[in-house]
């Protein structure tokens, strides 16, 4: 799989830009702040319907414009597909696949499989659990796009349940009775347990498959500085390691029943996959709080490379993007990383200094300057 062409209209700093890319290595060179990352952010958005830099869509639209448009032509197994996304802040995005409008924007998920590593990924190691949950869910959707619907359904249930709990909490706090009716809470408990079990099962399966790839990728990048490991940490007690939906539903239902008083007291849902975490370790120690900057960087990179390797094992050849990675690595780690990714079906690398990129990865070269992209 590779992206043949990318076009942006009113996306970030670009009023209008187009670039024809090549299979294999593509290097985007330019000073910091000229818009290199905006280009790969757009591709990442097509792959995940999410930005790796901001939490909302509004910053993606160029100042003064009403909407942004991303178009990319993706070639997979000899066939080309045009994907178009229109981003309108405050409204549902619109999408097209080929010549046909998509019923929902998320219908484009799976059309472009892409793994992106960026400096922000240091938060996978040092940041809050939400960063690691997002990492798992994005990879889960890349492997099996149907999980986009599972995640959306679960998040909708949590929002509805939180609204009910919040209303009841405020009613009790003010001494009133209006809005304090929790008669429908059991219904939302059932929905949360069912949808949560589906999402939890997917994550557990994913982590089991991903773990050996993380260990190998970290060893390949960091070369003997210790063994990396991952483990899923659910917010509910599971009697035995299981991905059986019925068992997980029962465990979530029991946890919801046991925690109901605390949830009513706090006015929010305290149980479910949205409270889970992915534990990262280096040797016997948790990476968060103990890993050095270099170790944290290498571990974050290993998480992305592990996802990339897992997709390839699944028979998917994703596009791999490395945003400003090589400047953070010493010569040895640069060379080892180049060996790991040199055979990617398509590799996009951004850099401020071209000499930071190992020679074996210097394929098609593009210069980014002044809102324009030119083939060098």
Swiss-Prot record:
Pfam families: SMC_N. Keywords: ATP-binding, Cytoplasm, DNA damage, DNA repair, DNA replication, DNA-binding, Nucleotide-binding, SOS response. One of its GO terms (molecular function) is ATP binding. It is found in: Cytoplasm. One of its GO terms (biological process) is DNA synthesis involved in DNA repair. The RecF protein is involved in DNA metabolism; it is required for DNA replication and normal SOS inducibility. RecF binds preferentially to single-stranded, linear DNA. It also seems to bind ATP. Belongs to the RecF family. This is DNA replication and repair protein RecF. It comes from Salinispora arenicola (strain CNS-205).
């Amino acid at each position: 799989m590779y992206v043949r062409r990318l076009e942006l209209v009113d996306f970030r700093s670009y009023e209008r830009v187009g670039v024809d890319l090549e299979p294999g290595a593509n290097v985007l060179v330019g000073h910091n702040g000229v818009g290199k990352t905006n280009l790969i952010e757009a591709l990442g958005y097509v792959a995940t319907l999410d930005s790796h830099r901001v939490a909302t869509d509004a910053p993606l639209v160029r100042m003064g414009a009403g909407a942004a448009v991303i178009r990319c032509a993706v070639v997979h197994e000899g066939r080309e597909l045009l994907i178009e996304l229109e981003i309108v802040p405050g409204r549902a995005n619109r999408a097209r696949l080929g010549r046909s409008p998509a019923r929902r924007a998320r219908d484009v998920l799976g059309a472009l499989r892409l793994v992106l590593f960026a400096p922000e990924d240091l938060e996978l190691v040092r940041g809050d659990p939400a960063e690691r949950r997002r990492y798992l869910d994005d990879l889960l959707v890349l492997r099996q796009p149907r999980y986009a619907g599972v995640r959306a359904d679960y998040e909708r249930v949590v929002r509805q349940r939180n609204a009910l709990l919040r209303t009841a909490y405020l009613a009790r706090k003010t001494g009133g009775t209006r809005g304090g009716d929790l008669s429908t809470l059991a219904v939302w408990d059932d929905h949360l347990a069912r949808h949560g079990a589906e999402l939890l099962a997917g994550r557990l399966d994913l982590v089991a498959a991903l773990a050996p790839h993380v260990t190998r990728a970290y060893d390949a990048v960091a070369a003997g500085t210790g063994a990396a490991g991952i483990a899923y940490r659910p917010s509910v007690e599971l009697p035995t390691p299981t991905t059986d939906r019925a068992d997980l539903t029962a465990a979530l239902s029991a946890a919801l029943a046991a925690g109901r008083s605390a949830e009513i007291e706090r006015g929010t849902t305290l149980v479910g996959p949205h409270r889970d975490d992915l534990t990262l370790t280096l040797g016997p120690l948790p990476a968060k709080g103990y890993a050095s900057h270099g170790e944290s960087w290498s571990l974050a990179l290993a998480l992305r490379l592990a996802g990339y390797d897992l997709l390839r094992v699944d028979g998917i050849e994703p596009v791999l993007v490395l945003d400003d990675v090589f400047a953070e690595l010493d010569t040895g780690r640069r060379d080892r990383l180049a060996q790991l990714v040199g055979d990617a079906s398509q590799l996009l690398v951004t850099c401020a200094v071209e000499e930071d990129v190992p020679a074996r990865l210097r394929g098609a070269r593009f210069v980014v300057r002044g809102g324009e992209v030119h083939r060098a």
